[in-house]
Amino acid sequence: MNTMNSVLECKELALYGGSFDPLHKAHLAIIEQTLELLPFVQLIVLPAYQNPFKKPCFLDAKTRFKELERALKGMPRVLLSDFEIKQERAVPTIESVLHFQKLYRPKTLYLVIGADCLRHLSSWTNAKELLKRVELVVFERIGYEEIQFKGRYHPLKGIDAPISSSAIRASLGV
């Protein structure tokens, strides 16, 4: 993982937010493939305190952050941020985007999301403003049909790990 200073020098920034509840190998594959797709980008991994579209998290924010910290240690061009966790509330994506745009002033800001999120993107807080401010990087989700999206995006294909956090929690009876 890099320091904040290395982010300051970056012209391309990507945000990958999520609950990471729990963290699994598909999350890590998405990070690796984003870095391959965008070779000059600095990637900020942004665990949510609470996803506004989901039930409260199974694992507390501190535990999820520590899991990510261990998993991302030594990964070049990756920074773990506790911005949303520190808010202690559900943070709309546009708020995080505005925060990181103000903080780092990147020329390009990418937002990494799952294809399943495209289905309800229009219901996100200030969705139109969000789409003006970011370029989407969309990863396919196994088990989800291909979604027709009229906007421009960078596809991430071949995430071979079909495991979802929801499936892991269900297998644990949670």
Curated annotation (Swiss-Prot):
The keyword ATP-binding applies. Its EC number is 2.7.7.18. GO terms for molecular function: ATP binding; nicotinate-nucleotide adenylyltransferase activity. Signal peptide: none annotated. The keyword Heme does not apply. It is an enzyme of class 2 (transferase). Keywords: ATP-binding, NAD, Nucleotide-binding, Nucleotidyltransferase, Pyridine nucleotide biosynthesis, Transferase. One of its GO terms (biological process) is NAD biosynthetic process. InterPro entries: Cyt_trans-like, NadD/NMNAT, Rossmann-like_a/b/a_fold. It catalyses: nicotinate beta-D-ribonucleotide + ATP + H(+) = deamido-NAD(+) + diphosphate. Pathway: Cofactor biosynthesis; NAD(+) biosynthesis; deamido-NAD(+) from nicotinate D-ribonucleotide: step 1/1. Catalyzes the reversible adenylation of nicotinate mononucleotide (NaMN) to nicotinic acid adenine dinucleotide (NaAD). Belongs to the NadD family. This is Probable nicotinate-nucleotide adenylyltransferase. It comes from Helicobacter pylori (strain J99 / ATCC 700824). The gene is nadD.
